[in-house]
């Protein structure tokens, strides 16, 4: 059992880092890091010539173009061209920039052509096999990097025990991340008539390594015939970019300007969990009914 002296010391240390980080973020401009997933030799999900890396780069550049029109927002990109960027470098870019927000954009892809819908992830732990598969997919890019074992200190995205062993380094930002993720999904549903699979917590390395609120957005499934066409279309990219940009600006107004809008606590905003497998296999009629409402499925355990 730690002594009272050690407990007091640790408490002071935590306060020091909390205040230090808080002041480091208090810049004249709201700084957003936009991260287009995959790139270069890592195409991400592919179906019928549609590549995830191309879609997400286009969407990120469009988001940046919208945000840069706002003089109070500074945009930082992890990549602006078709190049491979390692997960550690992506996190380092965000941390060195002392960003206020980290946005990583991806597309989903599975063997089934029936799965569809958007979903947005925040850092957290989950024991469901479905979500662990997604975590493996997004973390698997690690193996393309040289000396990955040394860089990531034995982190193995294919080992569920490793995933479950990830520590949440940014619990203080969890509420903000969920708030942003919820607004993004709401915008997709209301503004773009998309089917939302919800907001979820998941042990994704790049979110764990960035010391700021952050989300990983899955724009949809390139493996779904209709959704794949929408994701790769100019209309789809424009709509998704606007929905994400609007959510970011709303987040900035709520949190960065010193005025936090009243909202439900994290505990009170978590409804009963919905089985994601049952959603993927539901009928088209059922999906159409669901598409008019956003289902938030923040999985704590």
Model-derived regions, located:
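Short linear recognition/processing motifs and adjacent strand/loop elements at protein termini
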Residues: 2, 23-25, 257, 261, ...
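Catalytic-core regions of hydrolytic enzymes
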Residues: 25-155, 170-174, 178-182, 229, ...
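Structural motif
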Residues: 31, 100, 212-214, 295
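Active-site-adjacent mobile loop/cap segments within catalytic or ligand-binding domains
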Residues: 33, 44, 162-259
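Flexible hinge/switch segments at interdomain interfaces of large molecular machines
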Residues: 151-160, 216
